[in-house]
Amino acid sequence: MSKEKFTRNKPHVNIGTIGHVDHGKTTLTAAITTTLAASGKAQAMAYDQIDKSPEEKARGITISTTHVEYETDNRHYAHVDCPGHADYVKNMITGAAQMDGAILVVSSADGPMPQTREHILLARQVGVPALVVFMNKVDMVDDKELLELVELEVRELLSKYEFPGDDIPVVKGSALKALEGDTSEIGRPAIMKLMEACDTYIPAPVRAVDKTFLMPVEDVFSISGRGTVVTGRVERGIVKVGDEIEIVGIRPTQKTTVTGIEMFRKLLDEGQAGDNCGVLLRGTKKEDVERGQVLVKPGTVKPHKKFKAEAYILTKEEGGRHTPFFNGYRPQFYFRTTDVTGVCTLKAGTEMVMPGDKIEVSVELIAPIAMEKELRFAIREGGRTVGAGVVTEILE
């Protein structure tokens, strides 16, 4: 059977379910696919099809996630659901499933719980742009005032973590009822209402190609008579022949001009996000550029040494450390294409970090790296991944 062609006639948005264990994230995911399948906009997935998540690796870390896809009238969605809390933490920190928005699932019977709080905080730290709330299990609450209290509590919690708590759409319903085909307002109509909220409230993502140019340097060659060629995969934006660019990171920033671009040995006028290409640089010597630097549009990205991060430290079973580490820990931080040694300062009150912990940490690198908030990195010891992190704040 030939594969179906993916037709790109609607904007594509990456989305996911977040929230406390047993509040109904996976049931909701199943309910969305089943409800939309009725109008041919998704393939219905049963709860247990979603719950047994395949494992995947991101930055050397094994994460269990399930990906489902569905469409509304306006958009095509790729939706990720994780079985366990640790998988969510790892997923959000490694950026394995980049989310343009998320559906926060809260059980109306329980209200916000510790992981509700933690997922909201994580969403804020890793830069999930928008959240929509689904208050699940409303059929288990008889008292209308109680529902209003839970909604208030959720909105306050969102505001506390700097999301617009007063404006975020809150949809009330029962994922289980919808999954069973219930047509009362808490069943399928609630799911349709939720999808409408996602369509209107989660902003359309800016495509990588529309952002400012950035390409990590993977390799450097000198071609006699032509100059120096830098190869890598364009991370975002577009680079054209004749563009002025900066080489940022590790050493003082240099300016140069692109005199040629090639891909698969063919000359191009421009390279764009996703392309693996070679960029010829005017007057640049091979020894002026190295792996770990980036080519960027001038003035857009600065090199930094000190930053704050949110990180997940692997367990022994995941191939991580067997022992805790303490303040002053000095691993390597792998940014884009290279390792840079750095010193960790733990948050006041944290004595030590155990394998399996999620931590807030301040890092000072021995060399500056082109860095922005939300940049992901791996923590390594002699080439072995022992953790993953995301930059939450640049200190200097």
From Swiss-Prot:
GTP hydrolase that promotes the GTP-dependent binding of aminoacyl-tRNA to the A-site of ribosomes during protein biosynthesis. One of its GO terms (cellular component) is cytosol. NCBIfam families: EF-Tu, PRK00049.1, PRK12735.1, PRK12736.1, small_GTP. Residues 136-139 are annotated as: G4. Its main location: cytoplasm. PROSITE patterns: G_TR_1, G_TR_2. Monomer. Residues 60-64 are annotated as: G2. It holds the Pfam family GTP_EFTU. InterPro entries: EF-Tu_GTP-bd, EF-Tu_GTPase, EFTu-like_2, EFTU_2, G_TR_CS, P-loop_NTPase, Small_GTP-bd, T_Tr_GTP-bd_dom. The gene is tuf. Mg(2+) binds at residue 26. It comes from Bdellovibrio bacteriovorus (strain ATCC 15356 / DSM 50701 / NCIMB 9529 / HD100). This is Elongation factor Tu. Belongs to the TRAFAC class translation factor GTPase superfamily. Classic translation factor GTPase family. EF-Tu/EF-1A subfamily. Residues 81-84 are annotated as: G3. GTP binds at residues 19-26, 81-85, 136-139. Keywords: Cytoplasm, Elongation factor, GTP-binding, Hydrolase, Magnesium, Metal-binding, Nucleotide-binding, Protein biosynthesis. It is an enzyme of class 3 (hydrolase).
